Amino acid sequence: ERLRLCELAFPDADVTPMELRREGKSYTVDTLREISRGNPGAELYFLVGTDMLLYMEQWYEFRALFSLCTLAALPRADGDLAEIERYAAYLRKTYGARIEIIAKTPLPMDSTALRAALPRRGGADRLCDAVYSEIIRCRLYGAKPDLAWLRGKTDAYLKPTRIPHVRGCEETAARLALRWGEDPEDAAEAGILHDITKRLSDDEQLRLAEKYGIVLN
């Protein structure tokens, strides 16, 4: 699933599954060697964040890694740039490492926090639409859709005259859920989705029911 998400996130890049195919322990230096063998003469760049750069000396065969690529270091948080510059200077002097610093405004994000946000209907503002859509489609990481995002997606499947009705159902469902002690956001999601197939023909609806194993009388 992560391979598929990478392909969606970087449509213009060649995303390789070589590390998934590799048996046993897999190290970054092995991947760089394999890429280098397959692309003789190519200049390789390895994108790293502050947290990775500061612990490079603990990486497996880090000296060989330095010889195979240029490190492209990105700050992960405000205030990281000065620390990156100091440590990069040390690695250059001590090991002859090639390091380029990408002085961009950091986007505070970590994968653990992002995965934790997805079941709480967060994350849509941190991910490209293709990736977020796939996560919601497959319900990866227990994700629940951001309701504003879901409205934007479902409105395209509704006649304009149907949208006010759907909004009313969403609001009523949320109020009733609160009244009876249920999750109002889950109820709102059901309200948003309840008319999603209205524009489909009868044959299209039957095919959809068959696809999802819905038995019709």
Predicted feature descriptions by range:
Residues 143-158:
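Extreme N-terminal tail/first-helix region
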Residues 132, 174, 206:
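Short glycine-/small-residue-rich flexible loop motifs, especially phosphate/cofactor-binding loops
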Residues 1-146:
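Nucleotidyltransferase catalytic core that binds NTPs
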